[in-house]
């Protein structure tokens, strides 16, 4: 019966683990709903500020901000968004694979790449695998604020302002639905012409309108473009947070289900071992009685 006892101990351990993963699944589901609410709440601001920036730029063609001018690409920057914690399936790995593909492409073109990492997993990745990490931020918590991101964003914007970067991208997970999250690479700077055209089309569809600018359009555009980049990075962070909780919920559900299957298999093995032990005891008793 020694083998049966060991199996029973294993079953008990797996059941305890199953309780933990089941609890983590429920916690992740609750956190995912809150993260989705934050993601949804941030979308109108990010969408509207882009629309306003595009409108001001179109209404004042005499002033072309450097954030809207294409340059010869010699160096690019990536703001890479990850989670602070693991147990989220392949969520972070998929982002890192996307960044690695991008970096490989640019290196083949003779272009240098700088990185700003948001989230402890991204910071650890670049420390372990190399890459010119110029800024990093982790420990944002479950409800990040724009102020928490300004430092890392400012480093990349300063490099762009000084001509050290010619393009700036943000890489994060896109929330498709609860079951699906996919890595996405978005160009932040220069502001893409296609995006400007889309925003202009949306403006025309909503009617003809204009603003009164104080103190002037140039000053306003200078400030709004910085806010635009910050809002896009913040949107990426809160969307990635929703993806993290969804991925963790699915991962913990799979772990709970797998634990259940393993328990079923072990209980079958346990019952067979117990049956074999009982059969052996009966055989020994019968054999002893026959000898007498």
From Swiss-Prot:
Keywords assigned: ATP synthesis, Cell inner membrane, Cell membrane, CF(1), Hydrogen ion transport, Ion transport, Membrane, Transport
Recorded topology in the membrane: Peripheral membrane protein
One MF annotation (Gene Ontology) recorded for this entry: ATP binding
Record flagged with keyword Cell inner membrane: yes
PROSITE patterns: ATPASE_GAMMA (PS00153)
GO biological process: proton motive force-driven plasma membrane ATP synthesis
Compartment annotation: Cell inner membrane
Cellular component, GO annotation: plasma membrane; proton-transporting ATP synthase complex
Domain of life from the UniProt record: Bacteria
A Pfam family per the record: ATP-synt
Gene3D superfamilies: 3.40.1380.10, ATP synthase, gamma subunit, helix hairpin domain
Annotated family: Belongs to the ATPase gamma chain family.
NCBIfam families assigned: ATPsyn_F1gamma (TIGR01146), PRK05621.1-1 (NF004144)
PANTHER family: ATP SYNTHASE GAMMA CHAIN, ATP SYNTHASE SUBUNIT GAMMA, MITOCHONDRIAL
Assembly: F-type ATPases have 2 components, CF(1) - the catalytic core - and CF(0) - the membrane proton channel. CF(1) has five subunits: alpha(3), beta(3), gamma(1), delta(1), epsilon(1). CF(0) has three main subunits: a, b and c.
Role description: Produces ATP from ADP in the presence of a proton gradient across the membrane. The gamma chain is believed to be important in regulating ATPase activity and the flow of protons through the CF(0) complex.
Record protein name field: ATP synthase gamma chain
Organism for this UniProt entry: Chromohalobacter salexigens (strain ATCC BAA-138 / DSM 3043 / CIP 106854 / NCIMB 13768 / 1H11)
């Amino acid at each position: 019966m020694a083998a049966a006892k060991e199996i029973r101990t294993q079953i008990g351990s797996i059941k305890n683990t199953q309780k933990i993963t089941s609890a983590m699944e429920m916690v992740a589901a609750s956190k995912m709903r809150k993260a989705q609410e934050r993601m949804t709440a941030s979308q109108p601001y990010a969408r509207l500020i882009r629309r306003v920036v595009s409108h001001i730029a179109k209404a004042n063609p005499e002033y072309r901000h450097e954030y809207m001018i294409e340059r010869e690409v010699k160096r690019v920057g990536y703001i890479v968004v990850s989670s602070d914690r693991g147990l989220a399936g392949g969520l972070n790995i998929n982002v890192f694979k996307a960044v690695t593909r991008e970096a490989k492409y640019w290196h083949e073109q003779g272009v240098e790449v700088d990185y700003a990492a948001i989230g402890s997993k991204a910071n650890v990745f670049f420390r372990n695998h190399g890459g010119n990490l110029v800024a990093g931020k982790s420990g944002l918590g479950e409800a990040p604020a724009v102020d928490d991101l300004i430092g890392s964003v400012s480093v990349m914007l300063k490099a762009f302002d000084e001509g050290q970067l010619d393009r700036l991208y943000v890489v994060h997970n896109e929330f498709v639905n609860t079951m699906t999250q996919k890595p996405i690479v978005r160009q932040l700077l220069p502001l893409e012409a296609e995006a400007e055209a889309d925003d202009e089309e949306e403006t025309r569809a909503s009617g003809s309108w204009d603003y009164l600018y104080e103190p002037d359009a140039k000053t306003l555009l200078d400030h709004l473009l910085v806010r635009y980049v910050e809002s896009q990075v913040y949107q990426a962070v809160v969307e990635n947070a929703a993806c993290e909780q969804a991925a963790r919920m699915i991962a913990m559900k799979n772990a709970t289900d797998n634990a259940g299957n393993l328990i079923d298999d072990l209980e079958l093995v346990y019952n067979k071992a117990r049956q074999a032990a009982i059969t052996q005891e009966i055989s020994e008793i019968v054999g002893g009685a026959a000898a007498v």
